[in-house]
Amino acid sequence: MLPLAGHAHGTHIVAMGNKDPIARTTGGVPRQGKVSADVAAFVSKVAAVARPDAAQDGRLLFALDATMSRQPTWDLACSLQAEMFKAIPEEAALQVQLLYFRGFGECRASKWVADASDLARLMTGIDCRGGNTQIGKVFAHARTEHGKRRINAVVYVGDAIEESVDELAEKAGQLGLLNCPIFLFQEGRDSRVEAAFRDFARLTKGAYARFDASAPQELAALLRAVAAYASGGRDLLKVQGSGPAQALLAQLPR
């Protein structure tokens, strides 16, 4: 794992979303029926964006909040990450880089891997630790990697924002200008976090969906959809027959 440079925003840190696990357990479960609708919209939007370089191997940055309250979600993500590779046909390829933050200013990126077992080994050896969000570092790293070689999709999974939303929106806008879409998964129902995540998705021409641990099949479908987009663009995503995959098309601008 490679450490990422960066620093805390100090007085610019703005608390958004209760990261206390008890509070999230009692108030952070999406309404039944709402998740399916969000999944449908998310999948529809993804397929509306055409990849400019579908002839090359797709590259997907898989970023997760690994602070203490996120351990259950991290465990679920570990079990579901292989679904991303199942969406890729034999003639195509997908490279994934794991990026996570936790603790006091710790933000690390893995090497790029092209196999589910390699990614699983990287994720299994990591535990969650208390700390504030570092989404700004995620966006900055995505821009750096995108400058080296195009990233076709950034996936971010989190439940809170403890940084300046305006500063994050500016960084998201920079990624949008570079045609680097972010697909944001929100656990919980904090309306302020949702509004910010949706704005980041809009600015980058990406998409937003809820991350519902009680619906692993829908989450798997979402991951497959984004992976299909990253490796083959809109055409490969259209081949995905699942409802979530088709619904993701609706959000992405043409």
Language model: regions and residue ranges:
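Short, structured coil segments at secondary-structure junctions
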Residues: 178, 196, 203-204
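Acidic, polar low-complexity linker/tail segments
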Residues: 2-61, 68-74, 90-92
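Acidic, Ser/Thr-rich peripheral helices and adjacent loops at domain boundaries
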Residues: 111-124, 201-211
